[in-house]
Amino acid sequence: SLQEMQWMDCCYLHSGEYFHGPFECTDEDHLYILLMGTGAARVMDERALTFLEKYAKKYEVIDAKELGIDAIDESVNEYFCPMLFYAMSVAYRTGLQDKRRHPLDMRRYMGVVEY
């Protein structure tokens, strides 16, 4: 997560997670990265996006449809969304590591102090 690896007050989330707590923290200061999948849950993803558009200033949307998931048969492409999102998140956090000069394995506490 970007909280762990980059010490950023931000997280990737999908609508199932968002509406079980994080949306109560939505404001103009927190960054959210919404992962929009396909399939039955997309309706909830769209609701989350509508909420973010209304109440947040800082958010990014990673939409599987915009990334070409429709090249995979519609009956199964929702099962490939997590793999697509993972690959995207690896590229994104690697880019952040370089831009922010903050190595992904740098930790304050994990493996450093006893807890």
Predicted feature residues:
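A SIS-like phosphosugar-recognition module
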Residues: 1-115
